[in-house]
Amino acid sequence: MENNAYPTLPLKNTVLFPHLVLPLSVGRAGSIAAVEAALSSEDKLIAVFPQKDPRTDEPAADDLFRFGTVGIIKKMVRSEDTVQILVQGIERVEQLEMVQKQPYLSLKIATLSEPSDTGTEIEALHRTVIELAGKMIELVQPQIQVGIHHIISDVEKPLHQIYLLTSILSLDFDKEKELLAAATQVEALQLMHRYLNHEVQVLEVRQKITSTAQTEIDKKQREYVLRQQLEAIQEELGETNPEQAEIKELRQRMEETELPELVRKEVEKEITRLERMPSAAPDYQLTRGYVELALELPWNKTTEDRLDLKRAREILDEDHFDLEDVKERIIEHLAVMKLNPEAKSPILCFVGPPGVGKTSVGQSMARALGRKFERMSLGGLHDESELRGHRRTYIGAMPGRIIRAIRRTGYQNPLLMLDEIDKLGRDFRGDPAAALLEILDPAQNAEFHDNYLDLPFDLSKIFFVTTANTLDTIPRPLLDRMEILRLPGYSDEEKQHIARRYLIGRQIREAGLSEIQLSIPDETLSYLIRRYTREAGVRELERMLGRIARKVATQVATGQTQPVTVTPQDLVELLGPERFFAEEMRQQLAPGVAAGLAWTEAGGDVLYVEAALLPEGKGMTLTGQLGSIMQESAKAAQSYLWSRAEELNIDQKTIRESGVHIHVPAGAIPKDGPSAGVTMASALTSAYAHQPVRSDTAMTGEITLSGLVLPVGGIKEKVLAAHRSGIQRIILPKENEKDLREIPEHVRQSIQFILARRIEEVLAEAIPDLNR
C-alpha cells in the first residue's frame, strides 16, 4: 500500500478511524465516482480524508486534512441520487500529492506506522481512560455499562480502544481530526483523557440539576398527597370548615396563575401563614386580602395594541371636533409603537379650561389603542399614601390608587388618566407630587413598590395621561416629566359644530326623544351659546341643551304630538331670562376705561380696567383684588406716562395735583399677571388726557419702564374671548405674531390684529385723538 494512489472520498463533518466501521451517505458526483472506482478495483480500497472546511463543495488536495484513513468498502446500496456505503477503516495514512481531480479525486498516500510506544505512563493513562469511560457510560446509560465494558476489553491495543470510544463519545469534528493526527499512543491517550474528563464533569452537573429538580418535584408531590389525605380525614370526621375551603381555593388559584418567582414565593408564604392562623385572628382578613390582591394583579397579562393608524384617526375624528395638535401627537406615538414595539410611552399632559374634552380625549386614545381605560381624580389629594398605599401594619391598610386602578382593569398596560393633577395638595402626611415623580418616571417605575403590596410591580407599560387647567400649580420636577399638549377653548362657530355633531343628538336620546320630535336651528343654537353660556368649553352648553330636551320631553309625555322647533324667543320660556350681557362689548367707553384680555383657568375673558383721577389726591389706589404683579404693572405704567407726559400731550399740572384710582371689576375674583400692563397704561393715559379709548378695541401685553411691549401667553384663549364679546380690533405684542397661526381662520378674518413693539404704538391705535 506504500505510496500508492487511491480514489479519495472527502468527508464534510465526520472522521473514519482505523478498525471502525462507518456508514456513509455519498451524494456528490465526484465522491460517487470515487466509490465506483474503488469498488471496481480488486482490493476495494478507498482513501477517506476529512475536509478542512465543510462548506467546500468540490475539494482539491489542499482542501483536505493532512491525515486520513484507508478503508475497505464492505457494502454499497444505490438510491435515486445518493449511494449508501459501509466502510471499515484499516490504517492511518498521510497524503503526498494529488494524482487527479476529475472525474474523481485521487491522491498518492503514505501509510503511517501504528504507534507502539509503551511504559508505565501509557499504562496509567490507559487505566484512567478506561475508568473515565466506564463512569461516563454509567452516567448516561447504566444498564449497558457491563456490555460496553466487555466490548472495550475485547480490544487488545490501547490505541484501538481509544478509536472505539469515539463511537460512544460525541466529539465535534475538530476534536476527531485532532485525535486522528495523534502521532503517539501517549498523545492519543492524553487527548481522550481530556475529552472524557470534560464529558464526565458536564454529565455530573446535569445529573445534579436533574436530581435537585426531581427532589423538589417529589417534595411537592408528597405535600400534595399528605394534604389530600388530611382533607379526606377531616371530611370523614366532619371537621371541614369554610376557611379551609377558602385557603384551598387560594392555593389552587396560585397554582393556576402565572406569577413571577418572587411573587409566587411571597404568596406561598402568606397562604402557609393563613393555614396556621385561626380565622378569628386580627391578621387573618388582612392576610387573605393581601393574597387575593397579589393573585388578581395582572403580573404578565397585557392587551395587544391596535396600531392601525387610519382606524385610530377615524376614531379620534369621530369622537372629537378639531384638536388637530392632540390628534397628530397621538398618531405619531402609534407610528413609533408600530416601528419600535419596545418604545416607552410618553407621559402626556392635556392642559386647558374645563369642558374642552381633556378626559374624553383620553377615552378616545384608549379606544384607538385597544387598551383598557381607567380614570383617577387627583383633585384635593393631599396624602402620599393614597398613591403609594398604606403599610400592612396599620389598621385598615389598603393598596394605593395606582395598584387598585390596575387591579380593576385586569391588564398590565391600561391607559391611566390622572385627572386634575394641578389640584394636588400637600400636608404633614407627605407630598403626593413627590410620589408621582417615581410613578411617572420611565427610569424608575419598572419596579414600583406599593407600601401595601411590598413587591416590585412594573408600571412602565402603562400609558399615563394627565389633565390640568393650569401649569402654574404643578411642581417643576413633575412638570419636566410630562409632555404638554394644550387644548384651548372653542370659538362660537366651533361650539356650534360640536353641538350639532355630538351634543344635541346625545341629549335628545337621553331624554327619550327622536330627532323628529325636537329640532334646534342654527340661529337658536348661536343665540343659546352667546346669551346662556360663557365658557371656553362646551359643558354648560350641553347642560342647557339637556334642559331644553327635558322640557320638550315633559310636553311629549303630557300628550303633545306636534314636533317642536325651538326658536330664540322660546329660550326665555325654556331656560329663563338671558344670563349674559356683559360679553357684548360696551358701545362707548368713558375716558379712563380700557378693554383688556385676560387668561383664566376657564379660558379667556374680556377685562375692563377703569382709571379715575382724584382731585387733590396723592399716590395710587388699586382695587379689585389685584396681585403683586398687576400692582407693579400699574406703577410701571404710571411712571412711564409721567416721564413721557409732554410727548403724550398730557397736562403735567394734572399729574402733579391729582391722585389716581385704578379698579378692575369683578372684585371678588383675585387677579394677577403681567398681561394687563398695556391696558393699564391705556386707561391711565385716557384718564390723564380726557380722551376715550376706542370701544371696539381690546389689548394685552406686558410693558417695561422704557415703553417696550413684551409678549404674553394664552393668546388663543384671549382672542376667542374677544371674538365672543364682539371685539373688532385687538392690539398684541409684535412677538406674539407667531401665535396667530393657532387662531381659527374664521376668527382671524373677523378681527383686525394690530402688532405693537412700543407703548406709543398701542396708545396711537387705542386713543386716536390723543395728540390732536
UniProtKB/Swiss-Prot annotation:
InterPro entries according to UniProt: AAA+_ATPase, ATPase_AAA_core, Lon_bac, Lon_bac/euk-typ, Lon_lid, Lon_proteolytic, Lon_Prtase, Lon_prtase_N
Residues where ATP binds: G352, P353, P354, G355, V356, G357, K358, T359
Keywords: ATP-binding, Cytoplasm, Hydrolase, Nucleotide-binding, Protease, Serine protease, Stress response
GO cellular component: cytoplasm
Keyword Electron transport: no
UniProt-annotated catalytic positions: S675, K718
Family annotation (CDD domains): RecA-like_Lon
SUBUNIT field: Homohexamer. Organized in a ring with a central cavity.
NCBIfam families xrefs: lon (TIGR00763)
Described purpose of this protein according to its UniProt entry: ATP-dependent serine protease that mediates the selective degradation of mutant and abnormal proteins as well as certain short-lived regulatory proteins. Required for cellular homeostasis and for survival from DNA damage and developmental changes induced by stress. Degrades polypeptides processively to yield small peptide fragments that are 5 to 10 amino acids long. Binds to DNA in a double-stranded, site-specific manner.
Entry protein name: Lon protease
Source organism per UniProt: Nitrosococcus oceani (strain ATCC 19707 / BCRC 17464 / JCM 30415 / NCIMB 11848 / C-107)
